[in-house]
Amino acid sequence: MADLEVYKNLSPEKVERCMSVMQSGTQMIKLKRGTKGLVRLFYLDEHRTRLRWRPSRKSEKAKILIDSIYKVTEGRQSEIFHRQAEGNFDPSCCFTIYHGNHMESLDLITSNPEEARTWITGLKYLMAGISDEDSLAKRQRTHDQWVKQTFEEADKNGDGLLNIEEIHQLMHKLNVNLPRRKVRQMFQEADTDENQGTLTFEEFCVFYKMMSLRRDLYLLLLSYSDKKDHLTVEELAQFLKVEQKMNNVTTDYCLDIIKKFEVSEENKVKNVLGIEGFTNFMRSPACDIFNPLHHEVYQDMDQPLCNYYIASSHNTYLTGDQLLSQSKVDMYARVLQEGCRCVEVDCWDGPDGEPVVHHGYTLTSKILFRDVVETINKHAFVKNEFPVILSIENHCSIQQQRKIAQYLKGIFGDKLDLSSVDTGECKQLPSPQSLKGKILVKGKKLPYHLGDDAEEGEVSDEDSADEIEDECKFKLHYSNGTTEHQVESFIRKKLESLLKESQIRDKEDPDSFTVRALLKATHEGLNAHLKQSPDVKESGKKSHGRSLMTNFGKHKKTTKSRSKSYSTDDEEDTQQSTGKEGGQLYRLGRRRKTMKLCRELSDLVVYTNSVAAQDIVDDGTTGNVLSFSETRAHQVVQQKSEQFMIYNQKQLTRIYPSAYRIDSSNFNPLPYWNAGCQLVALNYQSEGRMMQLNRAKFKANGNCGYVLKPQQMCKGTFNPFSGDPLPANPKKQLILKVISGQQLPKPPDSMFGDRGEIIDPFVEVEIIGLPVDCCKDQTRVVDDNGFNPVWEETLTFTVHMPEIALVRFLVWDHDPIGRDFVGQRTVTFSSLVPGYRHVYLEGLTEASIFVHITINEIYGKWSPLILNPSYTILHFLGATKNRQLQGLKGLFNKNPRHSSSENNSHYVRKRSIGDRILRRTASAPAKGRKKSKMGFQEMVEIKDSVSEATRDQDGVLRRTTRSLQARPVSMPVDRNLLGALSLPVSETAKDIEGKENSLAEDKDGRRKGKASIKDPHFLNFNKKLSSSSSALLHKDTSQGDTIVSTAHMSVTGEQLGMSSPRGGRTTSNATSNCQENPCPSKSLSPKQHLAPDPVVNPTQDLHGVKIKEKGNPEDFVEGKSILSGSVLSHSNLEIKNLEGNRGKGRAATSFSLSDVSMLCSDIPDLHSTAILQESVISHLIDNVTLTNENEPGSSISALIGQFDETNNQALTVVSHLHNTSVMSGHCPLPSLGLKMPIKHGFCKGKSKSSFLCSSPELIALSSSETTKHATNTVYETTCTPISKTKPDDDLSSKAKTAALESNLPGSPNTSRGWLPKSPTKGEDWETLKSCSPASSPDLTLEDVIADPTLCFNSGESSLVEIDGESENLSLTTCEYRREGTSQLASPLKLKYNQGVVEHFQRGLRNGYCKETLRPSVPEIFNNIQDVKTQSISYLAYQGAGFVHNHFSDSDAKMFQTCVPQQSSAQDMHVPVPKQLAHLPLPALKLPSPCKSKSLGDLTSEDIACNFESKYQCISKSFVTTGIRDKKGVTVKTKSLEPIDALTEQLRKLVSFDQEDNCQVLYSKQDANQLPRALVRKLSSRSQSRVRNIASRAKEKQEANKQKVPNPSNGAGVVLRNKPSAPTPAVNRHSTGSYIAGYLKNTKGGGLEGRGIPEGACTALHYGHVDQFCSDNSVLQTEPSSDDKPEIYFLLRL
C-alpha cells in the first residue's frame, strides 16, 4: 500500500476532476475469460463507495465496493490480458481492478489513455483515503453511506422523496414490524416541510433516528444521569469507570468524547452528552467488544518460535479449488497483508528452464516462481516486521533447483541471512523478535552424514502433493487423442456440481466435513470418459455423467466408534497402518520415495528443516519441522496427545489439509491448536467457519501472525483432553447478557431476498477452545423483528483455558423447518472487554448485537458451586477419581458422537418438525434448551478421544443450564463470600433411594413418570451420595439445627450451590449462616429430621432427569435448572403408609413447596459471591424486560417514571407477557440491618438482581423456572418455633427440618429480616405464580402443579400449546399434570382448583378485576400480624395485584388491582408475609423432588376422607399443651375448597378466635362460570377411578367414624362442620387451603413447647417491616360464615 501514499496528497482540484469524470461515467470494454469484450458504461456512485456498470442482467451484482478493491494495476498485467494476442489493445488504455476475497479481476480497456489515467488515479485516491481513515471515521462513513443508500433504494420512483407506502415497504425490508399507525405517526412528525405526505432525505434521516431510538441505551443513559436526558462529564466518567471498567478516566477524555460524538451544538457548549451522542459513542469502536489495545502487538515476542501459533496458508497461490482454479501471485500479497506468516510455494519444472508454481497433477494454471518471490519480497513486511516462513515444496530437477536457490538469494538478499540471529541458549529456536525482517526457507535439507563437498544428495520425498495416489494424478498425455480441453471441461463440469452442493451444505453444519475421497471418483469418471471414443454421442455422455454423480456427493461424517481412528477418509485410512506397531504409526504402507536435492537449496534451510512425519520422536536436533496431513495429525493427536504436546514444546509442526479436499474446504484447526501445533495451514481463499476462527485467533496481538501459546503448553505436561486440565489454576466465568440486536438483515441466501418474511432472530453463543470448554447456548427467539429485537437473556460459561478460547456469536433466523444463518462474529476470549459492548457482525455494515460482559475469576475446587452454574454434582463427588461411576472405559473412549442417547442424559435430540412449529416465542432453540455440547465440527474432530460420559463426569461440557447469575453482569465478585462453602452432602440416602423408584407405574406396569432414571450413572451417583450423607440423618432434630439443603442443578448441569447453617443456634439469617459456617461437617441433611426410611423422596429430581414430552421420546424438556435437595417439612406432611410405600419405593409423603423453597433459599448465597455492589444500570436493563419488542416505547415507559428507588425500596418493573398493563413501584421493604448485602440468584434468564430476604423466620422459596422473561421468585419468610418433641415421637415430629430455629419475640432478631434493597425484574414478580406459599404448611407442590394460575406466565398463551421447553415452573408443572404425571396433584384438588385458577389467570390476563375489591393495604397487612403458622401463597398476591402493582406510585390502593372475582369455592384470603424475598430460582423444569403417582395410579389407600366426623387424627408432634385446650375451636370458611387435610388438621389445632376486621379478597362467583380452558380434563377413566377411590375411601371412613381420634395417627380427616362466624377468614391460601393457626397467645415464649409447622410466624407487629402497616395492626382470625360442610382429601403419595 506504500504506493497509495502519493495519492493522499493530490491537489483538491485534481481529485474533484477525477471524481466528476468517474461519476458521470465512461464507456469501457470489459474483458472476460473466453469471450469477446463487452462494452459497458462504468461509473462511480454518488457516495463514492461503489463502482457500477450498466447494462447488466444482474443489476444488484453489477457493482464493486471500493472497500473491497485490493489493488489497481496499469497495463496488460492480468492473466486475461496475457491470453489476448499482442497488439490487440494499447497497454496504456488497459487497467485491471483486483477485488474481493478471491482476488477476482475486472479487466477494462478505455478508448484513450487519458481516461485510463483518470480512473486509475481516482480509484487509488479513494483506496488511499479508506486505508488511512481510523476505525471511527470509517464507521461513521459507512453509516452515512448506508442511510443514503437505503433512502435511494426505497425511492422506487426516483423522485428523491419517499411517500408513506414506500416507507412501509422499507420497514419490511429492514425487518421492522411496527403498527402502521405508529409508522404514520413518526412519518408525520418527521414531515415538517410544506411538501406534506413525502419525506426528503433530510426528513428521512430524522424519521430514521426516531425509528431507531435505542430504548436500551436510553435507559442506560437515564440510570447514570439521574433521570435527565443527558450525561454530564462527571456522570460519563462514572459510567466509564463503573460499567465499562475503564481505568484512568480523565475529565479531558470525557470532554473529548462529548466533542467527538455529541450531535447537538447546544449540548457541546454545555459539555453534556445527549442520547444521540451517547448512542454514537456506544456504537463506536470505543465500545466494540474487541479490546482496542489488541489491535497492536501486546504479547511477549522474545520466546522461541515453537511457543507461538503462526498463521499459515496452504497452497497460497490458488484462488479457488485444488483442481481447476487459477494460480495468482496476488494471492501471496493478499495473505501476507492479512497477517499470514507462512506461505506455501509448490515448485515444478517449467518450460525454458524456468521453475513454475502450481498444484501438481491437476489442471490449475501456472505462474512463474520468480514472480512469486518478487511479490513476497514486496509485501512480506508491509504490515508487520515479524519473520515470514516460505514453505517450499520442491518437485524440480537439480538444474531448476539451482535456479530456485539463485532467485531466492538474488531477490531476498539479506532477508535470508540468519548468521546474526541470536538463538539464545543452545538448542533453542530463535524468537520472532530476533528474526524481524527475515525470511525463513522451510524445505528439505541434505543429511549431515553427507560431506560438505557433496553437491547433491537423496532426501525423502514425502509431501502433500504426493498424498494424491498415483492412479488419481492427472497425467497430461492422452493415448486416445482426447484433447486437454475435453478433459478439462469434463472435470470442470463434475467439480462445479460438486462445489455447488458443497456450498449449499456448508452453512455452519457441525457435521459437515466437506468433500473428500473425490479425486478417485473424478479419476474413475475421467477414465471412463476417456475410454469412450472422442465422438461419443451426447446422450451417452449425459447418462454416464448422471451415474457418476453418486461419487461426487459430499458425505456427512459417519464416524463409527472412537475405537477406530477418527478419520472419515476411508481412502486415506487404507494407506495408514493401524498404529499397533510402535514407531511405525505413521509410516505409510507404500514405499518411501526419495528425490535429489542440490546443496545450494539445502543450505538456505536453517531453522525449518522439513522432515517426513515418521513419528513424533524428538531426535534432539532443533529446527526440524514435522509435516502432517490433517488425517495423520488427527491420529497423533488422538493416540499420543501428551507426547505430541511435548514434541511441540521444542519443534515446529505443520498440519495441512487432506488432498481429498479438492474444493479447498478447510479442516477444523482447533484440535491441532489444542495439541500445541504451530503451523496449521488453511486455504485462505475459502471463506467459512474455519477461516473465521483462524482470523479471530490471529486478530489478537495486532494481527501480526504470531500468537503466544499458553504457558502450560510451552513447558511441562499438559493433557488438553482432561476434564479438568488445569486443576490448580483459576477458571474464568463469562457472564454474557445478550440485550438486543440492531438492524439484523434477512439471511444472505434468503429465497425471496428483501421481500422475504421479517426474520425471527435468536443469538447463539459458542465457546470454542479446549474440549472441556467447548459448548454453546442460545437465547430465545424474538418473532418478527430484525430491526431492534430485545432478548435480555444471560448466558454463563466457565472457561478453563481462556488464553486459547474463542467466543463466537451467531445470529440465526428461526424457521419452523430449521434456521437460516444471518451473521457471525468471532473474538478471542482474551480480547473481550467487560461492560456494555456492541458486537458488529462480520461483513455487515450496520448489523450488531448489544451485550453486557462480565468476566469473573473462579478460584478453588469448590468455587464452581458458587459462580459456575454449569458444574454438575458429579464433579464434586469425585467422578474424576471413580470413573466406574459412569462406566468410564478410560480417558479416550472412541465414541465420536457428541453424546449418545443410551448413556448420556445430555444428548440433544433433533426436534421433530411438529415440535419446532409449536415453539415460537417461548420457543425455538429457546432458552429452555440446554447448551449443546460441542455441537460443531471442532469438537467432534478433537474429542473423539473423550467419552461423553467422561466429560460429564469430569465436569466437562457441563454447561447445560442457564446462568446462575443473579446480578447485573457488571458486578464484581466478592471473594469473601467464597470462604464458607460447605460440602454438598445434604441429600440423604432416602432422597436417593426414592429417586431410583420414582417412576410411577400404572397397573400394566407402564411407565407413566416422565423422568425415569435410566442412566446407571445416576444410580451409582445416588448410592454414593446417600452413603456420604446418610450419617447426617440421625441428628437429634430437637436441637433446632437449621437445615438448608443443597439444591444443585440437574445433570444437565448446574450447581446451585448449598449452604449449611450451623446447627443448634438461633440464626437470624438463614443464608448468612452460609458464610459463617465454613465447617462442612455441620451441614445437615435436609432430611435430618426424617427417620431413615427409604420412602421419603424429596430429591427425586436431584439430577434433573429430564421429563420427556408427551408421547415423543425424542423430545426432552431440557430443564435448565432443577429444584432439588428439597427439604421435606414433615410438619406439613403426613406420612401415611410408610410400610406400604416403602415396598414400592415410593415417596410416602406429600411434598410441600415450602420445603423446596426452604431448601433453595440458601442456595443463592453461594452464588452471591459473584454478585456484590450492583451497578444501577444493570438493574435497569435487568429490570426492564422489553417484552413487547414491537412497541418502541413499551419498555422505556415501563421503567422511566418509576425511578425513585430509595435504599429501602426495591424497584419492581413489570412488563407483562400478556400485555397487561406494565406497572411498577416500590416494594415497601426496608433493608434490615445486614452485615453484607448478598445477592444471589440463579436466574438464568434475564433477572439478575434480587436479594434473598431471609428473616429469622423460615426462608422458604420455591423454584420457578425463568422463562424467556426471567422471573424472580418472591418468598415469604416466616418464623417457626422449633418443636421440642422427642425425635422418636413420630416421623412428623421431625418435621421442623426446614425451619430455622425461631427467634421468638424475646429474641433480639425477632423483628429483623434480611432484606437488602433489590431491584427485581418485572417479570420476577410473576414467578410468584409458581412460587406460591413460601413456607406454607398447606400449599403442597400439588397445589402449584395443579393450579393453572401458576401458568399465568407460561409461554405466551394457553398451556395447551406450550412446548416443554418454555421455562416456567408454572408451565412445566402444569405440563406434568397435563401429561398425566401430575407430580403431586390430587385429582380432586385439581378439579376444585381448576375453575379458580383459570378464572384467576384470565382475570389477570385481561385485567378485568382491577377494582373488584380493595381492602386497604394496612388492613391486609394487619391480617398478617398474628399469623403464626402460616405462609402466604403469593399466588394470591399475584392475583391480588399485590405483586403486580407492588405499591406502584399510581396506585396506593394497590393491593387489588388485579383481583379476579372468585367463586364461592375459592375465597382466598391472603395474608401478606412479613417480608418478601426476591430470589431468582432455577426452575422446576424437572419433576418435583417428591415423586407422586400419576393421577391414574391412585388407589383408595392413597386418599382418606370422612364426610361427617370432626378432625379424626392429628399428628402428635403438632399437639402441645397450648393447643390441646383450643382443640375445640374450629374455623369456618365460605367455600367448599379442596383443602389439604393436613393443613386443616394444623389449622384446627392452632386456630383461635379471629378478630373481625379482615376483608375478603375474593368475592363469590359461581364455580360453573369459571373458565376452564387451561386445565386438562381428566379422562373418563381417571374420573371414574377418582370416583371409585373416593367412594371406597368414604366407606372406609364410615366404618371408622365411631373410633376415637388418635393424635398420632396419620390418617386424614376430611370433613367437619363449621361454626358460623361473622366474617370470612383471611387465612385462606390462594389455592384454597387453610393456613393453620392464628395464634393469639404467642406474645411471650408460649410457643416454645409447641410443634408448629415450618411456616409458622410469631406474632409480630408489622410496622417495623412494612411501611404499609400500622404499628398496632394485628391479623384477624375470625372464622368465615358458611355452614356448608367442607370436604378435604388427604393424598398419600
Curated annotation (Swiss-Prot):
Any single Gene Ontology cellular-component annotation: intracellular membrane-bounded organelle
Domain PI-PLC Y-box: residue ranges: 601-714
Give all residue intervals belonging to the C2 domain.
715-843
Q: Where is the composition biased (Polar residues)?
A: 1065-1086
Question: Could you tell me the keywords of this UniProt record?
Answer: Calcium, Cytoplasm, Disease variant, Holoprosencephaly, Hydrolase, Lipid degradation, Lipid metabolism, Membrane, Metal-binding, Repeat, Transducer
One GO process term, biological-process aspect? lipid catabolic process
Q: Which cofactor does it need?
A: Ca(2+)
Where in the numbering of this chain does the PH domain appear? 20-128
Which sites bind Ca(2+) 4? D813, H814, D815
UniProt-listed InterPro entries: C2_dom, C2_domain_sf, EF-hand-dom_pair, EF_Hand_1_Ca_BS, EF_hand_dom, PH-like_dom_sf, PH_domain, PI-PLC_fam
Tell me, in a sentence or two, what this protein's role is.
The production of the second messenger molecules diacylglycerol (DAG) and inositol 1,4,5-trisphosphate (IP3) is mediated by calcium-activated phosphatidylinositol-specific phospholipase C enzymes.
- Pathological association: Holoprosencephaly 14: An autosomal recessive form of holoprosencephaly, a structural anomaly of the brain in which the developing forebrain fails to correctly separate into right and left hemispheres. Holoprosencephaly is genetically heterogeneous and associated with several distinct facies and phenotypic variability. In its most severe form (alobar holoprosencephaly), the forebrain consists of a single ventricle, and midbrain structures may be malformed as well. In the most extreme cases, anophthalmia or cyclopia is evident along with a congenital absence of the mature nose.
Q: What is this protein called?
A: 1-phosphatidylinositol 4,5-bisphosphate phosphodiesterase eta-1
To which species is this protein native? Homo sapiens
Ranked from the top, the taxonomy reads:
Eukaryota, Metazoa, Chordata, Craniata, Vertebrata
